[in-house]
Amino acid sequence: MKATWDIFCSVVDNYGDIGVTWRLARQLVAEHGLAVRLWVDDLNAFTPMCPGADATAAQQWQHGVDVRHWPAAWLPVAPADVVIGAFACQLPAAYVEAMRARPQPPLWLNLEYLSAEDWVEGCHGLPSPQPNGLRKVFFFPGFTDKTGGLLREGSLLARRDGFQQSAEARRAFLQGLGVDLVPGALLISLFAYENPQLGNWLDALATADQPCHLLVPQGRVVAGLSQWLGEGPLHVGDVRTRGALTVQVLPFVSQDDFDRLLWSCDFNAVRGEDSFVRAQWAGQPMLWHIYVQDENAHWEKLEAFLAHYRCGLSDDADAALLGLWRAWNMDFDMGQAWRAARQHWPELQQHARLWGARQAAQPDLATALVHFYRNSL
């Protein structure tokens, strides 16, 4: 009999939380043959990344996953063999009580946010006894072999390589999004939160020697583009040109198409957790817009990742990359930082590829979770 898994997702950051849990659920079904229920409290955040999904359905099957609406008024269900609470979400009290009542309590995992901070290695896999007698285990994704690794489907990098080696596949995909490539242009994707340095970066792109084609999926940063252009709201399909820069607004796409978008671009600026990991697998230079926390607590998390990611760069390229990421996240001059990074482009390209290869040498997150469960039996 298949092991049953329940994954609970409370949507906080629009698409980041559901993005991670939806990828995980799909992979557990497709590659490990598990029976997975994904509980989501806001299906409106789920439907944009899963075409054909119904935001009003209490239950639906998508890609082999039993997707359930997590209602405010909980209805009794039998707990699964493995229960994952994503990102410290609080499970329904009645469900937890049903877990306790099982003859063999489920494996209860708290899937934490991704972090490169040193303390993660020491906390990964730690049990947390609960007052009701159950035991919850902290499971941390991460960038070292002492963590749970990163989400990565088994065929991902082979599919990426095949796509990137086919100019026709890239052209056809982009045309399907309504993108007619500007000849000789640097192709950039931008998926970000509001950012005070956006205008400085756009100015640098518009005045650069090489043309640039900026692809912007629907999202929070689009309003900043409209402001920079000095016009009303931009809509999907709109294309505007200023100087050397062409800006184009794209529709929100499925996760698989978002991967292809990242693979298609020469540079990817991303936000949150899911797109952050997928940009790393794209093997192209990238920039992460980290989620802002009170008292700039996110800066420590940013610097922890950079301490890993920068290893192996020359001193000059290292300084340029560090300057670019700090400018975008700490409100320094993004125009100057971008021009400095462009001076080291070949090295940054090679480094991005090598980083992905090093991460791929470690077990992926879904496999690590399955092994953890099997070892617990």
From Swiss-Prot:
Annotated keywords: Glycosyltransferase, Transferase
One GO MF term: protein-arginine rhamnosyltransferase activity
Coiled-coil ranges from the UniProt annotation: none
Consequence of changing residue 255 to A: Reduced protein-arginine rhamnosyltransferase activity
Catalytic residues identified in the record: 17 (proton acceptor), 273
Pfam families named among the record's database cross-references: EarP (PF10093)
Outcome of swapping residue 17 to E/A: Abolished protein-arginine rhamnosyltransferase activity without affecting substrate-binding
EC number of the protein: 2.4.1.-
Catalytic activity: dTDP-beta-L-rhamnose + L-arginyl-[protein] = N(omega)-(alpha-L-rhamnosyl)-L-arginyl-[protein] + dTDP + H(+)
Keyword Cytoplasm: no
Stretch forming the signal peptide: none
Effect of residue 271 to A: Strongly reduced protein-arginine rhamnosyltransferase activity
Result of changing residue 252 to A: Reduced protein-arginine rhamnosyltransferase activity
Binding annotation for dTDP-beta-L-rhamnose: 15, 193, 255, 271-275
Described function: Protein-arginine rhamnosyltransferase that catalyzes the transfer of a single rhamnose to elongation factor P (EF-P) on 'Lys-32', a modification required for EF-P-dependent rescue of polyproline stalled ribosomes.
Domain remark in the UniProt entry: Adopts a GT-B fold and acts as an inverting enzyme that converts the beta-configuration in the dTDP-beta-L-rhamnose donor to the alpha configuration in the N-linked (Rha) arginine product.
Sequence similarity: Belongs to the glycosyltransferase 104 family.
NCBIfam families noted in UniProt: efp_Arg_rhamno
Protein's recorded name: Protein-arginine rhamnosyltransferase
Gene of this entry: earP
